Amino acid sequence: MTEERKTNTPETEAVAESKNFILNFIDEDIAEGGQFQGMTVHTRFPPEPNGYLHIGHCKALCIDFGTAEKYNGLCNLRMDDTNPAKEDTEYVDAIQQDIHWLGFDWGDRFFYGSDYFEKDYEYAVELIKKGLAYVCELTPEEFKANRGDIGIPAVSPYRDRPIEENLRLFEKMKNGEVEEGKMTLRAKIDLASGNFNMRDPVIYRIRFINHHRQGTKWCIFPMYDFAHPIQDALEGITHSLCSLEYEEHRPLYDWVVNNVSIPYHKPRQIEFARLNIDHTVMSKRKLRKLVEEHYVSGWDDPRMPTLCGLRRRGYTAASIRNFCEMIGVGKTPSVIEYGTLEHCLREDLNATAERTMAVLHPVKLTVTNYPEGKSETFSVENNPTDPTQGTHEITFSRHLWIEADDFMEVPVPKYKRLTPNGLECRLKGAYLVKCTGCVKDENGNVTEVLCEYDPDSRGGDPAAGRKVKGATLHWVDAENCMDAEVRLYDNLFSDATPDGPDKDFLDCLNPGSLTVLTGCKVEPEMRKVAAEFDKQENRTGINAPTFQFMRVGYFCLDNRDSTAEHLVFNRSVSLKDSFKK
C-alpha cells in the first residue's frame, strides 16, 4: 500500500475526532441492538517486550488508552511475550515506565501473554479434536515451496492425519521429544484461500529456548495470530485495535475466536494506519542495530525515536499526546513531517518553559564606563506568556559574555547588533550599550568587545524617549556565570525516507546530527536547578528541567549526564517553527 506525505495543520486538530472512524464503529457496537450493547468498552495495549517503546507506538497507546477513557471504559496492558527469542524484563520495566510517563494507567489489569500458555495449549488440543488442526512435518523450506500461489492451492501431505495421531504427535512436541523445526501445528482452514494467511497457518512451533518468565517449562510456543485473539477474548476485550498490517489477518482472528469454546463474547478487531515520521526509522531491528553497533550512545540517545530518547531530549508527555491527537486516526498510510512533532513540543514549552539567558559561543563584553567591582541586580520575567511563573534575579557587572555573532567589526547591510560606532543595543533586562571598539589577539581574532552604557537606561528603557534601532541582546555576567556543555541535536538521518526501497538506512545517517559545545555560559541559578534534579531517584524516567534560552532555543538538562558540577544541556527544539500552518 502506498504512503502519502501528510502535513497536518491546526485545523486538523479540530476535525480529528470527526475523522476517527474507530469511534463510529464503537458507537454502533454499544448502541441498542449492537453486539456490545450495555457492555463496558474494553481495549488493550499489547507491546512485545523485545525493545523500548518509540514514537510509533504512541499513536496506538493514545488510541487504545484514549478510546477507553472516552467511553469511561477499561484498557489492559498485556506483554506479548509469546516469542521468547529477544524478550527481557528490562524491556517490561521500561515499557511500564514510559506508559505511566505519558499519563496512562492500566490499574490492576496488567497481564502477560505467557499467562495464557496453558489455555492456549488447551484450545489447540480442542481444535485438533474438532479436526480443525493437524501436525505438519514440512520443513521450513518445504513449507515455503508448497505454499502455492494466486490460483494455485497450497499443499501438505499431512493434512488428513487421523485426529488421534495428531494428538499424540502434539503431545510429543509439548514434551520436548521432537527436534526444533521438525514439526508444527497448523490450523486446518483452506489451502486454496485467496488470503494466504488462511492457507492452514502455523499456530504452534517448537523452540528450545529459555523464556524470561516461564524458563524452560515450555518448548512449544503459540504464534501471535493464534494466541492474540484467545487472549483478547479471555480478558473480555470488546475492541481489539491494531495497526493496518493486521487487516488481512482479521479473518484468521475471527476464525480462531469462532472455533474455540471461549465462554465469553467475541472481540472485534479494528485496524488503523500506523504512524510514520520522516527522517526516522521505527523498526526495532534497525534501532537495535544503531545501538549495538554504536551509531548512537544507547536506546535513550536523544536522537532516537524511543520515548526514553525523546524524554531525554526534552519532549514532554503533553506534547506527544497533543501530536497524536493532531494527526488523527485514519486508514491510509502516511508519512508525517518531523516538524509537526517539533511544533507540538514548541507550543507546549512556549507556555511552560522558564526563560533564561545562555551564551553558546561566548566573547567577552567589557562595559568600559561601568565601575570596576560594582554589581547590580535586575529582575527578569520567567515567562512573558504567563506572569504567574514569576521572576528571577540576574546580576550585571563591568564584564559580561555575549554571543560572538552579536558583534561584527565590519557589518553587513541591515546588521543591527554591536559594531564599532554603530547602533545602540539593549542588553536584555539591563542597560542600553553602544560599541566603541574591540580587542584582537595576534591572529586577528576578536577576544573582547568594548562598549559604553547609558546609566539612565536601567531596565533597557532609553532616556528621554530616545528611539533605539539596535537589537536586544542576551548576555550573562562573567563574574558569576556557570560553564556548561551544550549538545545540539539534529535529525539522525539526513534522508527524509531512510526506510525507502533500495536504500541502506545506515547510508542515510546524518554526520551532523550531534554537535557538542563546551565552555558555554549560563546563569548561576542553573547550578541550583541541577542540584535539585540530582536528588531525583528516577532521573531517566522523568523530564529534566527545561528552559528557553532566549534567542537560541529550548533546552533541558540531560537527565543522565548532567550534574550540579558539570552542567549538560540538550537542545530540545529550536525557536524557529518550520511547521506549515
State where each predicted segment sits.
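Core subunits and conserved enzymes of cellular information-processing
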Residues: 246-250, 254-256, 321, 325-328, ...
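N-terminal catalytic cores of NTP/NDP-binding nucleotidyl/phosphoryl-transfer enzymes
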Residues: 15-26, 31-96, 211-243
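Active-site cores that bind ATP or allylic diphosphates and position pyrophosphate for catalysis
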Residues: 77, 81-83, 89, 126-287, ...
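Long, charged, mostly alpha-helical binding arms that flank functional sites
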Residues: 265-344
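A glycine-rich helix N-cap at a beta->alpha junction
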Residues: 91-117, 123-124, 131-134
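Secondary-structure transition/capping motifs at alpha-helix termini
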Residues: 32-37, 66-74, 100-107, 130, ...
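Conserved short loop/turn motifs at secondary-structure junctions
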Residues: 46-49, 78-86, 108-118, 141, ...
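N-terminal acidic, proline/glycine-rich, low-complexity intrinsically disordered segments
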Residues: 1-9
